[in-house]
């Protein structure tokens, strides 16, 4: 059965993860209250919780960003990371997971949330993070525990091992039996559970359930298997050792019961963490951190406060760190620490030092960003694995309500991206708009609120412009002539342009076939610049593409000709020639790949068809039981709000990626409406 793995492992860091509204923040409050970190548990609904302390979280009554809080239990220090359950804010969870020793997956007996649970468990499995499953809201249970476990098991690749069974009183659960301890407890609201005699029907149920637990442990322990075959009861300490080892190695996912709102099951959960969760040495090994005397840390979250400046939430993987130390980053930055702060939800308590295992906030590490590996050594450390931001799926164009705030807006957007890399800011080269990309409606709404409340920038927003273009069907030869006489040197340029359509996707080509020096070679570049100017806005009001323009002839004046004159002449030639070329509107088409639970595939197909999507096919999602992957061609104009419908149809579990494929013609009434709307907006 191996050696005892339950020795103290230093300060530990535990992630609280789970589907949206499963009770993670309520569990954090219960943990902090039961361990004495706060006098009593706060409430999400009342806006008094430690976890949802930001104005945005309290306004929306949901976790919209990671919160870290530290407590102590039986002499050990624990930092809990309350991670958002909404898929729109999931990057905070992904960025933090490499730093944790273990995760508590908070869930409930709700089949609708099973796909969300599967996504979270898969993330933990791939990162090899030990995990407990806390079956919350057990006071509202309307299913027997075996039925619930059978429902949840498909979400996990490894066995869900029941550590406790409920004690029923009629149709209500009044306590539980700990299968490893072989003790029975009756819940007491907001108090420690009361130990009661294990007898009668509960004893029979305990023996059956305990044997089932031991059988699952024995799948990875030959000595235990032999004992079970010989009808020998294994020592209790040996069972705990097996639970700890198999948890650490990712062979099982223990399941514990409770009701966070009543603080039921919290102390047993803490004891399971204390006995079984790995410590910082195992976590550093899992991450591939090198052995060194220097301090080594992983930055998993960046925060900007109105008055406190930049804070980098950091897990110290090894070594000792003093305030004022200089840190080297794997990304190349160097910075001196301007303060070490304890993480207690508010980040306002100073510390002089930090040691391996501690989770702290480091002040004003300006070049250092989320996902960086930092070291107090003289050379930059090797980078440890960091989460890549999820590609954004929804965008808005933003502008400062007061133009005097334009620079301030740019700085604030940069800080928002630093805090949350899944928010992406781009400049539209065609419209020069600032476009803010995010993970959904709520994600963008909260970003707008933070711009206003934290950075003092009010914004206006609207849907971003679609990348429409236009092309031509008919060739033409057009002269462009610019002549201006205003005393002294005049302006003269004369060009003949052959304008030809190109196959779709060829873009723009320029050529010259001038003979006899009709247009001197030093003016050819100016002619091309004028052509580009003329193609920037065609007769329909959009950039022109898939066109070749050839300079074939022209004339010049030895005194009055100049680069400006020939550039102007070429632009005039385009502006006069293009309206005669039978312009046609083009819209961008993307390949969209959607992943969704199989039972939602029919709904997804209907949504795609209603949005002018051309379904290319679908297949089962590789390695994901009960999931499909649907591929389709879709106009960019129809993708804008796709994520809203997709999440509505999949209980928040569906997602998609997109890739530009080609430009396609738009004709008839649809084209007329697009052109009219564009001209009205201009």
Q: PLM features: residue spans?
A:
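Structural and coupling elements of P-loop NTPases
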Residues: 1-682
